[in-house]
Amino acid sequence: MAGSLVAQLKKGSTAALLLGLLREREMYGYQIAAELRERGGDNLSLSEGSLYPALHRLEAGGLVKARWQAAGPNRTRRYYSLTAKGRRHADTSVAELQSFARLMIRVTSGAPG
């Protein structure tokens, strides 16, 4: 049951996680995946089949823009960065997610309100 809860939480917070990372700096897809894996281990890792569609949805929504850059001979990388709208959305989403996480910890730890 815990695995399904983690999966649901990850699915529901993927956009906020990506926006939060891109708020720090521009990154390419593999770099984003590696950063998620480094910070969250297997619990936050995203497959290419989940990562790139999520990035494309953010791009279609005007929150992220992408550009191609040479990364060596005959090789390019697609870098993602936040638009102004994306930065505002990231700030709001990350703050809401952090507030919700604190609330969940407080409620589930049995600490008085």
List each language-model region with its residue ranges.
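Beta-hairpin "wing" of winged helix-turn-helix
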Residues: 59-76, 81
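Long, low-complexity, charged/polar intrinsically disordered regions in eukaryotic proteins
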Residues: 1-2
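Accessory beta->alpha helical hairpin/"wing" motif in late/C-terminal subdomains of nucleic-acid enzymes
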Residues: 82-87
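Amphipathic alpha-helical dimerization/coiled-coil segments
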Residues: 88-113
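Basic amphipathic alpha-helical segments that dock to polyanions
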Residues: 51-58
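N-terminal helix-turn-helix DNA-binding core of bacterial DNA-binding proteins
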Residues: 6-50
